[in-house]
Amino acid sequence: MSARGKARSRALEVLFEAEQRSVSAFDAMTARREKTDLVINPYTVEIVEGVVSMQATIDEFLQTYAQGWTLERMPSVDRIILRIGAWELLYNDEVPDGVAVSEAVALAKTMSTDESPAFINGLLGRLQKLKPSLLA
C-alpha cells in the first residue's frame, strides 16, 4: 500500500473512531498520538482536517445524490469513505479525480461490505460527473 493509501486508511480510522465515540476528530487524532509512538502522516492530518472543514457541504452532496439512501442509513464506514473520497475529489487538486474514486473503492473493498465498493463507485462517479456544477 502506498504512503497515501496508508494515510487514507488512518484517516478512516480516526474519523470512524471520532464518530463512534462522539468526540471531535481532532481529539481522536490527539488520543492516537498519545497512545503510540507512531508519527501520524501529514496527509492523514490533511484528510481529517479537510473532511471536518467541508463535512456539511460534502454531506449535503452525498445526501442529494445517494439515490434511495440517507446518510443515517449508510453503514458508518461507507459514509466516512464517501466523505474522504468526496473531499479528495472535490477539494484536493493534488489528487486526480479518477484516483480519488478508485482509492475510495479500494478502501471499501478492504474495510466494508461486499456491496459497498459498487455503491461508493457509483456515488463518487456521479459527483465526479457533476463536479463542475457542484463547485460553481
Swiss-Prot record:
The keyword Endoplasmic reticulum does not apply. Transmembrane segments: none annotated. Keywords: RNA-binding, Transcription, Transcription antitermination, Transcription regulation. GO terms for biological process: DNA-templated transcription termination; transcription antitermination. GO terms for cellular component: cytosol. The keyword Glycosyltransferase does not apply. GO terms for molecular function: RNA binding. Belongs to the NusB family. NCBIfam families: nusB (TIGR01951). Involved in transcription antitermination. Required for transcription of ribosomal RNA (rRNA) genes. Binds specifically to the boxA antiterminator sequence of the ribosomal RNA (rrn) operons. HAMAP family: NusB. This is Transcription antitermination protein NusB. It comes from Paenarthrobacter aurescens (strain TC1). The lineage of its organism: Bacteria, Bacillati, Actinomycetota, Actinomycetes, Micrococcales.
